[in-house]
């Protein structure tokens, strides 16, 4: 970057702005770096995003093809073996976890996601900053090339921000990655856009101060449209990034939710105003609007009560019932007309008459069957909507409410029937995400040889939340299903003998040997490492629970990948260990 001053080749950047020599230098510098040539920086920013999506799209196609072919013919060849080894190396590093303190800076916990964001940031910063022309000789010669580059790149990121904001979005459709897992990238793209926007602003301020001091800067902010129109979108984008931090969302979630979409609309409108059709940058905004609007319309017509079917604009009746005294209750929706879901998916529920503007995601604890099984949700009262509903139940024990269903969303595009070994691990109400996998595998034909269901609960009476479902799965699945329950609390209202007697009294021919119940807080690391010797060729691990549990499981599964890429050394026949984590149900 050249040294700055108030003159250029003997010309004062302000006093000589109308001279012939000044105009000559202006045309000369514009010819060196034409203003319109900067549009390529926006295009290559979009190309980078499209290339990333394409790689994820190919990955989804391969996995679906591999699952389908393996389900019909359990065999591998040299080509698939090489791919399996390459994938295991990627998972070995990708599943590893970063130190917890880094997540406070909105850095994702997994090494894989963090590495992608680092490389993306490196690409964008180098592409923006490395071209050595940052400024022109005088501000009057034309906008700073650095400012134009950064502004166009920030605008090019806008379509990705709005696409990733949708629960039903085009990127999920193409990649199979659910929106809640893409939310990290939604936040990252917003922060990247904000940083580029700041880089876009700095050269204008710097040159104005260098050439004419604060009075010159003040005059431009007062009289120049390009200056004063850029203030609102920059402030709004900064607020959107700051208020999206996890610690703020946890404290004032409902306030964040409603403020976020309102500021998102305001940001879009003010940015269109600021762009003012310059350099065709508004094309990116209209593209963002097209994706955004399409996604919203699709969600309204296919996922909500506006879906054109028998339940159009109608609520569904739900039965609510307390499950013990620990703030846990269940919601059962009997009428599931028009709603189809897969294991591991969740819905947003909006309760009529109870904070109607609020809705929350809850994992579906039941499976979708031909006889239209009811939707069951197990909810732990936290605060806000869930606490309000529980307080009403505290007086009534059971209650009926009208509820609007928005969903389903989430889950995994992998087919659990295509794995020979499935491990389901959950804590507390996280069982709502793993139980549907157990039920689905118990009731359908598949190549699965063994399903290990591991559930960690605080109290023994918590097992009653899904006791009947577990008994049915054990009866249907027989010896291929192992149910192992860990009761963390040593003291409980029920004794082990009392619970076993209740199981024996059921007409399911179950006894204490069918379910293994241990007492005391277990070591998840030890549980998974002990399973290493009994893994099959293709293995799927589903984990649902607290962030600390998911971090621990991810780290262990990362280590287990060595059974794949070192199978010749350890003499294992393991070809794949796939991990799927769920965030909802807590």
Region locations from a protein language model:
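Extended, low-complexity, polar regulatory segments
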Residues: 1-22, 56, 60-101, 374
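Reductase modules of NAD(P)H-dependent flavoproteins
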Residues: 2-31, 181, 265, 377, ...
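Membrane-embedded alpha-helical bundles of multi-pass integral membrane proteins
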Residues: 37-51, 82-301
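Transmembrane-helix exit/juxtamembrane "anchor" motif
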Residues: 53-75, 163-171, 245-249, 294-312, ...
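Classical protein tyrosine phosphatase
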Residues: 71-76, 151-152, 180-202, 427-454
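Non-transmembrane, juxtamembrane loop and terminal tail segments
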Residues: 72-101, 312-330, 335-336, 491-514, ...
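Membrane-proximal cytosolic interface modules of multi-pass membrane proteins
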Residues: 245, 254, 258, 262-272, ...
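Ferredoxin-reductase
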Residues: 313-400, 457-458, 486-488
């Amino acid at each position: 970057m050249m040294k700055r001053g108030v003159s250029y080749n003997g010309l004062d950047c302000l006093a000589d702005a109308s001279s012939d020599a000044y105009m000559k230098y202006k045309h000369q510098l514009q010819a060196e770096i034409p203003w319109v040539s900067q549009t390529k920086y926006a295009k290559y920013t979009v190309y980078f995003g499209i290339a990333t999506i394409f790689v994820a799209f190919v990955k989804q196609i391969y996995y679906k093809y591999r699952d389908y072919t393996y389900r019909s013919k359990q065999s591998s060849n040299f080509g698939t073996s090489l791919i399996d080894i390459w994938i295991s190396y990627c998972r070995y590093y990708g599943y590893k976890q970063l130190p917890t303190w880094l997540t406070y800076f909105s850095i994702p916990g997994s090494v894989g996601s963090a590495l992608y964001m680092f490389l993306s940031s490196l690409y964008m910063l180098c592409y923006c900053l490395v071209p050595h022309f940052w400024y022109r000789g005088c501000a009057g010669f034309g906008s700073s090339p650095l400012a134009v580059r950064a502004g166009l790149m920030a605008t090019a990121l806008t379509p990705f921000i709005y696409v990733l904001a949708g629960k039903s979005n085009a990127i999920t459709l193409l990649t199979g990655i659910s929106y809640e897992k893409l939310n990290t990238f939604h936040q990252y793209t917003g922060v990247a856009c904000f940083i580029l926007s700041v880089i876009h602003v700095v050269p204008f301020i710097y040159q104005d101060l260098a050439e004419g001091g604060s009075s010159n800067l003040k005059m431009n902010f007062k009289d120049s449209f390009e200056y004063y129109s850029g203030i609102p979108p920059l402030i709004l984008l900064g607020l959107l990034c700051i208020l999206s931090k996890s610690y703020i969302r946890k404290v004032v979630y409902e306030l964040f939710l409603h403020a976020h979409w309102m500021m998102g609309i305001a940001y879009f409108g003010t940015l269109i105003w600021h762009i003012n059709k310059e350099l065709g940058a508004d094309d990116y905004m209209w593209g963002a609007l097209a994706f955004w609007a399409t996604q919203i319309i699709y969600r309204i017509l296919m996922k909500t009560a506006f879906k054109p079917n028998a339940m159009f604009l109608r609520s569904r009746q739900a039965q609510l019932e307390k499950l013990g005294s620990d703030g846990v209750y269940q919601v059962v929706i009997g009428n599931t007309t028009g709603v189809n879901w897969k294991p591991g998916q969740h819905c947003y529920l909006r309760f009529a008459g109870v904070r109607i503007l609020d809705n929350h995601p809850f994992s579906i604890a039941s499976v979708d069957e031909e006889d239209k099984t009811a939707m069951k949700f197990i909810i732990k009262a936290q605060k806000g909507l869930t606490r309000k509903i529980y307080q009403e139940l505290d007086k009534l024990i059971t209650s009926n409410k009208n509820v609007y269903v928005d969903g389903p969303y989430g889950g995994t595009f992998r087919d659990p029937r295509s794995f020979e070994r499935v491990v389901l691990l959950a804590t507390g109400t996280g069982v709502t995400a793993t139980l549907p996998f157990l039920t689905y595998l118990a009731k359908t034909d598949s190549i699965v040889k063994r399903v290990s269901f591991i559930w960690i609960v605080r109290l023994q009476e918590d097992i009653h939340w899904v006791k009947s479902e577990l008994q049915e799965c054990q009866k249907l699945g027989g010896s291929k299903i192992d149910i192992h329950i860990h009761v963390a609390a040593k003291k409980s209202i029920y004794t082990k003998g009392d619970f076993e007697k209740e199981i024996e009294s059921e007409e399911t021919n179950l006894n204490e040997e069918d379910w293994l119940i241990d007492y005391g807080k277990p070591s998840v690391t030890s549980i998974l490492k002990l399973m290493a010797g009994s893994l099959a060729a293709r293995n799927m691990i589903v984990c649902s629970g607290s962030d600390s549990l998911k971090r621990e499981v991810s780290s262990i599964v990362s280590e287990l990948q060595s059974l794949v890429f070192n199978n010749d050394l350890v003499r294992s026949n393991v070809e794949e260990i796939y991990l799927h984590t769920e965030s909802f149900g807590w």
